[in-house]
Design a protein with these regions (language model features):
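Conserved Rossmann-like nucleotide-cofactor binding loop
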Residues: 13, 37, 261
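Mid-domain catalytic core of redox enzymes
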Residues: 24, 230-348, 372-376
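Dinucleotide-binding Rossmann-like beta1-alpha1 core, especially the glycine-rich loop
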Residues: 48-126
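Conserved flavin/dinucleotide-binding core of flavoenzymes
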Residues: 44, 99-100, 316-413
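General small-molecule cofactor/ligand-binding pocket signal
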Residues: 80-81, 226-228, 351, 383
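Glycine-rich FAD pyrophosphate-binding loop
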Residues: 22-46
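N-terminal Rossmann-like FAD-binding beta1-loop-alpha1 element of flavoenzymes
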Residues: 3-31
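Active-site/ligand-binding neighborhood in enzyme catalytic cores
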Residues: 112-240, 249, 257
Length: 413
C-alpha cells in the first residue's frame, strides 16, 4: 500500500497535521511514532502521586484558530487560567520577578544602581551598530551586568554551547524592553506584564498535567498512528517516485516533524546536505522530579543562571497542577551537565527522564542551513513542519499554527 501522506512523529505538530488532514477528508495517511504514545514533549507522567510534564508546557496563544483547535478537543472548561503567573530569576542571592530588566527595582538600591548604569551605557544607547551574534547583541542591548550575571550563564547552561556560537534570530523569545522602559519601571517600582513575549496568563488543565490535552487530541487519531516505530531507513525510489520508510511503508508525500540530524542518519548521510546538517544541532534535557518536606515557595517556576547549580529551571508542580501531590518540584538540566550523583536541588530525587530531543540550538548559520535543506527536499515531496521540521525554537502553539497553515496552503497549491 502506498500512502498519500506519511507523517514522521506524533508529537503536537504531527498530531495537528494528522487531525487537520483527516478533517479535510484525507484518510490515506499514516503517522510513525518512535514512542509508545503520542504527544512528544507535551506528555505528562504520574510518579508516586506527582505529575511531571516532560516539557513544562502552558497554553496561551494570540491565534484564534489555534485556540479553536485546542478547545475543540479539550474544552476550556477543563482548564483554568494561571493569573498571575509567578516566575522568578535567582540572581544576586535573591529572587527577582521575570523578566529581570523590567524588575531591577526589586534589587537592593546599590545593586540596582549598578545594573541601571550598565543598561544606560549599552551599545545601542551609545549608537554602536547592531551585532550579529547573541553574546555581543545582549551586551549591546542590555549592558554587561545583565549579560554576565544572568543571560550568558543561563543560556550557556540551557543550550550547552558557548554564547558566541548562538545567532540572534531567536531573540524574539526574549522580552524586548527599551532603556526608557527599564528606567520607568525602576522609578515606578512596577512592571508591565503585557511585555511578556508569551504566557503571561496561560491556561493549564484542571487535572492530570498538560499531557491530558495531547491525549484528547490524539484520541480519534490512534488508528492512523503506528507506535514504537523509529525511522531507521528512508530512501526515495526514483522509479516509483515514492518514499520508502524502513523498507515497509511507501508514501507519495512525507512530512517530517522530527529532528533532521536523526533523519539524515536514516537517509544514509547524503553528501548533498552534509554541510547544512552540520549546522543543525539539538540538545537533550533531563527532567528530574524531587519531593520536599514542605512547599518552599508559591512560584510557578524559577530560572537558575548560577553555574554552580546543575539545573537551569525549577517548576513547582503542586502550585499549578491541582491534582498533583504536595511538595513536588521538577527541574530541567541540559543532559551534558547532568550527574545523578551531584544533583544540586535540595529534595528527594524520585525520577529522572532524558528527552530524546529538547531544543533546536540556534547556532549561527542555522537558519540558512535549514532553509537549504527544506528547499532541497521540497521537489521530492519531503517537507518539514514544526519545532523539529523547521528547526526553530517554536512554542507548541506556533507548532500548531504552522501545521494548520501547512495543510491549508498545501491543499491550495
Amino acid at each position: 500500500m502506498t500512502y498519500e501522506y506519511l507523517i514522521l512523529g506524533a508529537g503536537i505538530t504531527g498530531l495537528t497535521l494528522l487531525k487537520k488532514m483527516r478533517q479535510k477528508g484525507i484518510n490515506n495517511i499514516l503517522a510513525l511514532e518512535a514512542e509508545k504514545e503520542a504527544g512528544g514533549l507535551c506528555r505528562s507522567f504520574y510518579v508516586e502521586g506527582h505529575v511531571v510534564d516532560i516539557g513544562g508546557h502552558f497554553f496561551q496563544t494570540k491565534y484564534k484558530e489555534v485556540e479553536d483547535f485546542i478547545f475543540a478537543s479539550f474544552p476550556k472548561e477543563k482548564m483554568y487560567k494561571i493569573d498571575p503567573r509567578i516566575s522568578k530569576i535567582s540572581i544576586e542571592g535573591m529572587d527577582v520577578d521575570y523578566p529581570l530588566e523590567s524588575n531591577l527595582w526589586q534589587l537592593p538600591v546599590d545593586k540596582q544602581i549598578k545594573y541601571l548604569i550598565s543598561v544606560i551605557r549599552n551599545g545601542e544607547a551609545l549608537g554602536k551598530p547592531e551585532p550579529k551574534n547573541y553574546e555581543e547583541w545582549i551586551r549591546w542591548k542590555l549592558g554587561d551586568m545583565i549579560c554576565d550575571n544572568y543571560l550568558l550563564p543561563y543560556n550557556t547552561k540551557l543550550w550547552g554551547v558557548t554564547p558566541d556560537e548562538l545567532d540572534v534570530d531567536w531573540i524574539y523569545k526574549i522580552p524586548r524592553v527599551e532603556v526608557e522602559e527599564v528606567l520607568r519601571y525602576s522609578l515606578e517600582r512596577q512592571q508591565d506584564v503585557e511585555k511578556y513575549p508569551c504566557h503571561n496568563r496561560p491556561y493549564y488543565p484542571l487535572s492530570g498535567g498538560y499531557g491530558r490535552v495531547m491525549e484528547a487530541i490524539a484520541k480519534d487519531e490512534l488508528q492512523n498512528i503506528k507506535f514504537n516505530t523509529k525511522v531507521t531507513k528512508l530512501r526515495f525510489d526514483e522509479n516509483e517516485q515514492v518514499w520508502v520508510i524502513n523498507e515497509e511503508y511507501k508514501a507519495k508525500n512525507v512530512i517530517n516533524t522530527t529532528p533532521w540530524p536523526d533523519l539524515y542518519e536514516a537517509m544514509g548521510r547524503p553528501e548533498a546536505i552534509r554541510e547544512q546538517i552540520n549546522k543543525i544541532k539539538y540538545n537533550k534535557v533531563v527532567v528530574s522530579l524531587f519531593e520536599t518536606d514542605d512547599n518552599p515557595t508559591n512560584y510557578h517556576w524559577r530560572y537558575r543562571p548560577e553555574m554552580e547549580q546543575q539545573h537551569h529551571r525549577e517548576l513547582y508542580i503542586s502550585n499549578f497542577v491541582k491534582d498533583s501531590k504536595n511538595y513536588g518540584v521538577f527541574t530541567e538540566t541540559n543532559a551534558n551537565r547532568f550527574d545523578a550523583n551531584k544533583v544540586t536541588f535540595k529534595g528527594r530525587n524520585l525520577f529522572n527522564y532524558t528527552t530524546p530531543a529538547a531544543y533546536p540550538i540556534p547556532l549561527v548559520g542555522r537558519t540558512v542551513a535549514i532553509t537549504a535543506i527544506l528547499d532541497y527536499f521540497k521537489s521530492k515531496h519531503l517537507y518539514g513542519v514544526g519545532r523539529w521540521g523547521e528547526h526553530q525554537h517554536h512554542n507548541h502553539d506556533i507548532c500548531i499554527k504552522h501545521a494548520l497553515d501547512f495543510v491549508d496552503n498545501f491543499q491550495a497549491s
